[in-house]
Amino acid sequence: MSTVFPEDSVGLVVPQTARFDEPLALACGRSLASYELVYETYGTLNASASNAVLICHALSGHHHAAGYHAATDRKPGWWDSCIGPGKPIDTNRFFVVSLNNLGGCNGSTGPSSVNPATGKPYGAEFPVLTVEDWVHSQARLADRLGIQQWAAIVGGSLGGMQALQWTMTYPERVRHCVDIASAPKLSAQNIAFNEVARQAILTDPEFHGGSFQDQGVIPKRGLMLARMVGHITYLSDDSMGEKFGRELKSDKLNYDFHSVEFQVESYLRYQGEEFSGRFDANTYLLMTKALDYFDPAATHGGDLAATLAHVKADYCIMSFTTDWRFSPARSREIVDALMAARKNVCYLEIDSPYGHDAFLIPTPRYMQGFSNYMNRIAI
């Protein structure tokens, strides 16, 4: 019996792997002699290869952005609400590419991959990466797919930083940049949150200096704590209050330090437990450092407008009112710099109670604004 997927789903998708044997020079001064990128595509590339859209993922994201890998999958890809027939990124119009970034832990070459020089996992020996390193690796994937110029590059959070970096590093190769819930650089507070998360991992006795795979263990406790800290910053006070309030798991207090008493405690522990079973600790360290290091305006003395002076793309910048991790003020910094540089930009600030995670939640105004912009650029 055939499985019936929703009409607006891309249906079953099969991940693909691209191998690159040309060395990739990295910002840290090291290089990778070879590497692999896992990716998925949705829709059809037109004859002129002018309808391609690149999806850049956030910290814990991956290549599986839409559709299903098997009929038995409980959930579709992480951005299925935005990718598919009739959705904002309409696969009847666009050819969509979504990849797992270099350094990831979902098939692309990363710390958990085998280092061909040693026959063991890279672990902590995997080089530190930057957003621009990812962009260079993504450009090679575009070359492999025969895509000279992207109709649009779209990303939320860390993905938005990649989209912005693309327009600066390869200005002729991007027509539109859709940057959602992002920032031109991290604030001191954001760097601090990342450092707390890293210390949770680094001080876990099971981390073993990053060589935990050799020991047959994982730093589960550290990963759990890192995820719990991060997850709090992705939500808003309003959404947490609405979802959990001060509700107890049972009808009484236990007056101890070990019981899970509040519903919000139970939720955070569940999120941490689930995350620690599927994500690599070294990848988490890499991703947070890439976030911390992102500061493209540093090359122009902190002047973002000067940094953007040479870009060719048009921009759509979106933010959410209760996002305190990357607040609307941070998005407006990008908008102001683009206007000062006399670039085409539209800005949508969306009233949403969901905090930073709002870019993943298909609220009506968000979907309408997103669709309106993508409809304007469809070939």
Swiss-Prot record:
Its EC number is 2.3.1.46. The record marks R325 as: Important for acyl-CoA specificity. Substrate binds at R227, D357. Keywords: Acyltransferase, Amino-acid biosynthesis, Cytoplasm, Methionine biosynthesis, Transferase. Pathway: Amino-acid biosynthesis; L-methionine biosynthesis via de novo pathway; O-succinyl-L-homoserine from L-homoserine: step 1/1. Transfers a succinyl group from succinyl-CoA to L-homoserine, forming succinyl-L-homoserine. This is Homoserine O-succinyltransferase. It comes from Pseudomonas putida (strain ATCC 700007 / DSM 6899 / JCM 31910 / BCRC 17059 / LMG 24140 / F1). The gene is metXS.
